[in-house]
Amino acid sequence: MTKPVWSCNEWDPLKEIIIGTSIGANIPQNDLSHHATNYANLTPEEYNAMPKGHYPLEVYEQAEEDLEGLVSILEQADVTVHRPDTSVIDFTTSVSNGKWITDQYEAYCPRDSITVIGDTIIEGAMSLRARYHETFLFNKIFQEKMMAGSKWFPMPKPMLNDSLYRIQPGKDPSITEEEPILDPANIIRMGYDILYLISNTGNEKGAKWLQNTLGDSFKVHMMHDLYSWAHVDSTIMPLRPGLVVLNESRVPKNKIPKVFDNWDIIWYSDDMCVGQKAHMDYAPASSWIGMNVLSIDPQTCIVPQEETHLMSAMEKHGITPVPVQMRHMRTLAGGPHCVSCDLVREGKLEQY
Protein backbone atom coordinates (compact mmCIF):
# COMPACT_ATOMS: atom_id res chain seq x y z
CA MET A 1 0.00 0.00 0.00
CA THR A 2 1.39 3.42 -1.01
CA LYS A 3 1.85 5.84 1.90
CA PRO A 4 0.31 9.33 1.55
CA VAL A 5 3.85 10.75 1.54
CA TRP A 6 7.09 8.80 1.16
CA SER A 7 10.44 10.01 -0.12
CA CYS A 8 13.85 8.92 1.15
CA ASN A 9 16.25 10.24 -1.50
CA GLU A 10 16.53 12.38 -4.63
CA TRP A 11 16.24 9.65 -7.29
CA ASP A 12 13.77 6.83 -6.55
CA PRO A 13 10.86 6.55 -9.06
CA LEU A 14 8.75 9.69 -8.72
CA LYS A 15 4.99 9.34 -8.26
CA GLU A 16 3.68 12.57 -6.76
CA ILE A 17 5.07 16.11 -6.58
CA ILE A 18 4.31 19.79 -5.94
CA ILE A 19 5.32 22.34 -8.59
CA GLY A 20 5.48 26.02 -7.60
CA THR A 21 4.14 29.17 -9.20
CA SER A 22 5.52 32.56 -10.20
CA ILE A 23 2.18 34.27 -9.56
CA GLY A 24 2.73 37.27 -7.30
CA ALA A 25 6.53 36.91 -7.21
CA ASN A 26 8.10 40.05 -5.79
CA ILE A 27 11.45 41.51 -4.74
CA PRO A 28 11.00 42.76 -1.14
CA GLN A 29 11.63 46.40 -0.37
CA ASN A 30 14.77 47.10 1.64
CA ASP A 31 14.87 44.55 4.46
CA LEU A 32 17.75 43.32 6.62
CA SER A 33 16.86 39.63 6.21
CA HIS A 34 16.75 39.94 2.41
CA HIS A 35 20.10 41.75 2.37
CA ALA A 36 21.76 39.20 4.69
CA THR A 37 20.25 36.10 3.09
CA ASN A 38 20.46 36.86 -0.63
CA TYR A 39 22.81 39.82 -1.07
CA ALA A 40 25.40 39.82 1.72
CA ASN A 41 28.06 40.61 -0.90
CA LEU A 42 26.54 44.07 -1.46
CA THR A 43 27.19 47.18 0.60
CA PRO A 44 24.09 48.78 2.16
CA GLU A 45 24.25 51.47 -0.52
CA GLU A 46 24.39 48.90 -3.32
CA TYR A 47 21.59 46.85 -1.78
CA ASN A 48 19.34 49.88 -1.27
CA ALA A 49 19.83 50.87 -4.92
CA MET A 50 18.66 47.49 -6.22
CA PRO A 51 15.37 47.33 -8.15
CA LYS A 52 12.51 46.22 -5.89
CA GLY A 53 8.88 45.28 -6.36
CA HIS A 54 7.16 43.19 -9.00
CA TYR A 55 8.76 41.86 -12.17
CA PRO A 56 7.81 42.78 -15.75
CA LEU A 57 4.67 40.99 -16.97
CA GLU A 58 6.60 38.86 -19.45
CA VAL A 59 8.60 37.28 -16.61
CA TYR A 60 5.40 35.92 -15.06
CA GLU A 61 3.95 34.86 -18.40
CA GLN A 62 7.09 33.05 -19.51
CA ALA A 63 7.76 31.51 -16.10
CA GLU A 64 4.23 30.11 -15.87
CA GLU A 65 4.48 28.78 -19.41
CA ASP A 66 7.74 27.04 -18.51
CA LEU A 67 6.28 25.59 -15.30
CA GLU A 68 3.36 24.23 -17.31
CA GLY A 69 5.90 22.61 -19.62
CA LEU A 70 7.54 20.97 -16.60
CA VAL A 71 4.13 19.79 -15.38
CA SER A 72 3.46 18.28 -18.81
CA ILE A 73 6.76 16.34 -18.73
CA LEU A 74 5.94 14.99 -15.28
CA GLU A 75 2.37 14.03 -16.15
CA GLN A 76 3.59 12.21 -19.26
CA ALA A 77 5.78 10.20 -16.87
CA ASP A 78 2.63 9.29 -14.85
CA VAL A 79 3.53 11.63 -11.98
CA THR A 80 0.65 13.26 -10.09
CA VAL A 81 1.26 17.02 -9.86
CA HIS A 82 -0.09 19.42 -7.23
CA ARG A 83 0.08 23.23 -7.42
CA PRO A 84 0.02 25.85 -4.64
CA ASP A 85 -3.28 27.44 -3.64
CA THR A 86 -2.53 31.01 -4.72
CA SER A 87 -5.82 32.32 -3.29
CA VAL A 88 -4.42 31.94 0.23
CA ILE A 89 -1.95 34.85 0.10
CA ASP A 90 -2.23 38.24 -1.55
CA PHE A 91 1.36 38.86 -2.61
CA THR A 92 0.70 42.60 -2.94
CA THR A 93 0.29 42.89 0.84
CA SER A 94 2.95 43.13 3.52
CA VAL A 95 3.92 40.53 6.13
CA SER A 96 4.76 41.24 9.77
CA ASN A 97 5.23 39.52 13.12
CA GLY A 98 4.76 42.71 15.15
CA LYS A 99 8.46 43.59 15.37
CA TRP A 100 9.19 43.99 11.67
CA ILE A 101 7.26 44.45 8.44
CA THR A 102 8.26 43.63 4.88
CA ASP A 103 6.82 42.61 1.50
CA GLN A 104 5.84 39.12 0.41
CA TYR A 105 8.27 37.12 -1.77
CA GLU A 106 7.05 34.23 -3.96
CA ALA A 107 6.06 30.55 -4.02
CA TYR A 108 8.11 29.66 -7.08
CA CYS A 109 10.36 27.26 -5.15
CA PRO A 110 8.45 24.88 -2.83
CA ARG A 111 11.71 22.99 -2.17
CA ASP A 112 12.98 26.04 -0.26
CA SER A 113 10.26 25.89 2.37
CA ILE A 114 9.07 22.27 2.58
CA THR A 115 10.39 18.73 2.24
CA VAL A 116 9.39 15.12 2.80
CA ILE A 117 11.71 12.80 4.73
CA GLY A 118 10.44 9.25 4.86
CA ASP A 119 6.75 9.47 5.79
CA THR A 120 7.03 12.94 7.34
CA ILE A 121 6.27 16.41 5.94
CA ILE A 122 8.70 19.03 7.28
CA GLU A 123 7.98 22.77 7.07
CA GLY A 124 11.06 24.92 7.47
CA ALA A 125 11.77 28.02 9.55
CA MET A 126 13.11 30.24 6.80
CA SER A 127 15.63 33.03 7.21
CA LEU A 128 13.86 35.41 4.82
CA ARG A 129 11.11 37.41 6.50
CA ALA A 130 9.25 37.85 3.24
CA ARG A 131 8.61 34.08 3.18
CA TYR A 132 7.05 33.96 6.67
CA HIS A 133 3.64 32.77 5.47
CA GLU A 134 4.65 31.01 2.26
CA THR A 135 3.85 27.48 3.43
CA PHE A 136 0.19 28.47 3.85
CA LEU A 137 -0.12 27.87 0.10
CA PHE A 138 0.48 24.15 0.68
CA ASN A 139 -1.78 23.71 3.73
CA LYS A 140 -4.66 22.16 1.79
CA ILE A 141 -2.34 19.52 0.31
CA PHE A 142 -0.77 18.80 3.70
CA GLN A 143 -4.12 18.53 5.48
CA GLU A 144 -5.24 15.92 2.96
CA LYS A 145 -1.99 13.99 3.49
CA MET A 146 -2.34 14.25 7.27
CA MET A 147 -5.90 12.94 7.19
CA ALA A 148 -4.64 10.03 5.09
CA GLY A 149 -2.08 9.18 7.77
CA SER A 150 1.11 11.17 7.13
CA LYS A 151 3.05 13.03 9.83
CA TRP A 152 3.30 16.81 9.44
CA PHE A 153 5.84 18.80 11.47
CA PRO A 154 6.21 22.58 11.04
CA MET A 155 9.35 23.99 12.68
CA PRO A 156 8.85 26.53 15.48
CA LYS A 157 8.07 29.90 13.91
CA PRO A 158 11.24 32.03 14.18
CA MET A 159 11.20 35.61 15.47
CA LEU A 160 13.70 36.77 12.79
CA ASN A 161 14.83 39.72 14.90
CA ASP A 162 17.56 42.02 13.59
CA SER A 163 20.02 40.33 15.96
CA LEU A 164 19.74 37.08 13.96
CA TYR A 165 21.51 38.66 11.00
CA ARG A 166 25.02 39.86 10.26
CA ILE A 167 26.12 41.04 6.84
CA GLN A 168 29.02 38.71 6.04
CA PRO A 169 30.38 39.30 2.51
CA GLY A 170 32.97 36.55 2.90
CA LYS A 171 32.73 32.83 3.51
CA ASP A 172 30.90 32.78 6.85
CA PRO A 173 27.08 32.54 7.03
CA SER A 174 25.09 35.73 7.57
CA ILE A 175 22.85 34.28 10.27
CA THR A 176 23.73 33.57 13.89
CA GLU A 177 22.65 30.76 16.22
CA GLU A 178 20.01 32.90 17.94
CA GLU A 179 17.19 30.47 17.02
CA PRO A 180 16.67 27.42 14.78
CA ILE A 181 16.70 28.36 11.09
CA LEU A 182 16.27 25.93 8.20
CA ASP A 183 15.26 26.33 4.59
CA PRO A 184 14.62 22.68 3.60
CA ALA A 185 16.54 23.33 0.37
CA ASN A 186 19.61 23.16 2.62
CA ILE A 187 19.31 19.37 2.81
CA ILE A 188 20.01 16.43 0.51
CA ARG A 189 18.26 13.16 1.38
CA MET A 190 20.46 10.08 1.15
CA GLY A 191 18.35 7.37 2.77
CA TYR A 192 19.32 7.16 6.44
CA ASP A 193 21.78 10.05 5.95
CA ILE A 194 20.68 13.68 5.61
CA LEU A 195 23.32 16.10 4.32
CA TYR A 196 22.75 19.52 5.88
CA LEU A 197 24.45 22.69 4.60
CA ILE A 198 25.37 25.30 7.21
CA SER A 199 24.77 28.58 5.38
CA ASN A 200 22.74 31.80 5.25
CA THR A 201 19.60 29.64 5.19
CA GLY A 202 20.38 26.95 7.75
CA ASN A 203 22.20 27.03 11.08
CA GLU A 204 23.33 24.42 13.62
CA LYS A 205 20.23 24.90 15.76
CA GLY A 206 18.13 24.09 12.70
CA ALA A 207 20.12 20.89 12.23
CA LYS A 208 19.62 20.01 15.90
CA TRP A 209 15.86 20.51 15.60
CA LEU A 210 15.76 18.33 12.50
CA GLN A 211 17.78 15.54 14.15
CA ASN A 212 15.63 15.61 17.28
CA THR A 213 12.45 15.56 15.22
CA LEU A 214 13.52 12.70 12.95
CA GLY A 215 14.94 10.64 15.81
CA ASP A 216 17.40 7.79 15.56
CA SER A 217 16.11 6.54 12.19
CA PHE A 218 18.14 9.24 10.42
CA LYS A 219 21.55 10.87 10.85
CA VAL A 220 21.88 14.58 10.04
CA HIS A 221 25.40 15.42 8.82
CA MET A 222 26.27 19.11 9.09
CA MET A 223 28.48 20.43 6.27
CA HIS A 224 30.57 23.45 7.33
CA ASP A 225 32.83 25.70 5.25
CA LEU A 226 31.46 24.44 1.95
CA TYR A 227 29.14 27.12 0.57
CA SER A 228 27.81 29.81 2.87
CA TRP A 229 25.09 31.35 0.73
CA ALA A 230 21.70 29.73 0.20
CA HIS A 231 20.68 26.12 -0.40
CA VAL A 232 22.62 23.06 -1.47
CA ASP A 233 21.04 21.87 -4.71
CA SER A 234 23.28 23.87 -7.02
CA THR A 235 26.30 22.50 -5.14
CA ILE A 236 25.56 18.78 -4.59
CA MET A 237 23.07 16.71 -6.59
CA PRO A 238 23.04 12.90 -6.35
CA LEU A 239 21.49 11.26 -9.41
CA ARG A 240 21.37 7.64 -8.24
CA PRO A 241 23.36 5.38 -5.90
CA GLY A 242 26.98 5.67 -7.00
CA LEU A 243 26.67 8.85 -9.12
CA VAL A 244 26.64 12.47 -7.99
CA VAL A 245 27.03 15.91 -9.59
CA LEU A 246 29.33 18.21 -7.59
CA ASN A 247 29.96 21.90 -8.20
CA GLU A 248 33.70 22.13 -8.81
CA SER A 249 33.90 25.75 -7.67
CA ARG A 250 32.27 25.03 -4.28
CA VAL A 251 33.27 21.49 -3.28
CA PRO A 252 37.02 21.09 -2.76
CA LYS A 253 38.24 17.54 -3.15
CA ASN A 254 39.16 17.44 0.55
CA LYS A 255 35.59 18.48 1.48
CA ILE A 256 33.65 15.86 -0.48
CA PRO A 257 31.13 14.34 1.96
CA LYS A 258 32.22 10.84 2.99
CA VAL A 259 28.90 9.37 1.88
CA PHE A 260 30.23 9.85 -1.67
CA ASP A 261 33.37 7.78 -1.12
CA ASN A 262 33.66 5.37 -4.06
CA TRP A 263 30.93 7.18 -6.02
CA ASP A 264 31.43 8.37 -9.59
CA ILE A 265 31.47 12.16 -9.76
CA ILE A 266 30.31 14.44 -12.56
CA TRP A 267 32.22 17.64 -11.87
CA TYR A 268 30.05 20.60 -12.84
CA SER A 269 32.89 22.89 -13.86
CA ASP A 270 33.32 26.27 -15.51
CA ASP A 271 33.72 24.45 -18.82
CA MET A 272 30.51 22.48 -18.32
CA CYS A 273 28.36 25.33 -17.01
CA VAL A 274 26.78 27.18 -19.94
CA GLY A 275 26.14 30.32 -17.89
CA GLN A 276 22.38 30.66 -17.47
CA LYS A 277 21.10 34.10 -18.41
CA ALA A 278 19.71 36.53 -15.87
CA HIS A 279 16.94 38.89 -16.91
CA MET A 280 17.67 41.44 -14.21
CA ASP A 281 20.65 42.98 -12.49
CA TYR A 282 21.50 41.39 -9.15
CA ALA A 283 19.76 38.10 -9.94
CA PRO A 284 19.51 36.06 -6.71
CA ALA A 285 20.68 32.82 -8.37
CA SER A 286 24.06 32.27 -10.01
CA SER A 287 24.74 30.53 -13.32
CA TRP A 288 25.38 27.36 -11.28
CA ILE A 289 21.60 26.99 -11.10
CA GLY A 290 22.03 24.93 -14.29
CA MET A 291 22.90 21.83 -12.22
CA ASN A 292 19.60 22.13 -10.34
CA VAL A 293 18.10 18.99 -11.91
CA LEU A 294 15.17 16.75 -10.98
CA SER A 295 15.33 12.97 -11.24
CA ILE A 296 12.20 11.12 -12.37
CA ASP A 297 13.92 7.82 -11.61
CA PRO A 298 17.53 6.53 -11.46
CA GLN A 299 17.70 6.43 -15.28
CA THR A 300 15.83 9.66 -16.16
CA CYS A 301 16.55 13.26 -15.18
CA ILE A 302 14.92 16.60 -16.05
CA VAL A 303 17.62 19.13 -17.00
CA PRO A 304 17.49 22.80 -18.08
CA GLN A 305 17.57 22.66 -21.87
CA GLU A 306 20.69 24.82 -22.24
CA GLU A 307 22.81 22.42 -20.17
CA THR A 308 24.02 20.35 -23.11
CA HIS A 309 27.40 19.52 -21.56
CA LEU A 310 25.78 18.24 -18.38
CA MET A 311 23.31 16.20 -20.41
CA SER A 312 26.15 14.63 -22.39
CA ALA A 313 27.92 13.70 -19.15
CA MET A 314 24.73 12.11 -17.85
CA GLU A 315 24.30 10.07 -21.02
CA LYS A 316 27.81 8.67 -20.61
CA HIS A 317 26.64 7.30 -17.26
CA GLY A 318 23.48 5.76 -18.69
CA ILE A 319 21.05 8.48 -17.64
CA THR A 320 18.49 9.82 -20.13
CA PRO A 321 18.22 13.61 -19.79
CA VAL A 322 14.85 15.25 -20.46
CA PRO A 323 15.37 18.90 -21.44
CA VAL A 324 13.00 21.52 -20.09
CA GLN A 325 12.72 25.23 -20.86
CA MET A 326 13.12 27.44 -17.78
CA ARG A 327 13.87 30.97 -18.91
CA HIS A 328 13.85 32.70 -15.53
CA MET A 329 15.79 30.29 -13.32
CA ARG A 330 18.27 32.95 -12.19
CA THR A 331 15.72 35.76 -11.91
CA LEU A 332 13.28 33.72 -9.79
CA ALA A 333 16.03 31.58 -8.21
CA GLY A 334 14.93 28.09 -9.10
CA GLY A 335 15.62 25.25 -11.53
CA PRO A 336 13.66 21.97 -11.86
CA HIS A 337 14.70 20.76 -8.40
CA CYS A 338 14.00 24.05 -6.62
CA VAL A 339 10.56 24.60 -8.16
CA SER A 340 9.38 21.19 -6.98
CA CYS A 341 8.88 19.18 -3.81
CA ASP A 342 8.44 15.45 -4.23
CA LEU A 343 5.72 13.96 -2.05
CA VAL A 344 5.90 10.32 -3.09
CA ARG A 345 8.77 8.30 -4.50
CA GLU A 346 8.78 4.52 -4.68
CA GLY A 347 11.54 2.65 -2.92
CA LYS A 348 12.59 1.95 0.62
CA LEU A 349 14.77 3.50 3.28
CA GLU A 350 18.33 2.34 2.63
CA GLN A 351 21.94 2.99 3.59
CA TYR A 352 24.11 4.47 0.84
Spans of features found by a protein language model:
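The feature marks the mature, well-folded catalytic cores of soluble enzymes
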Residues: 1-352
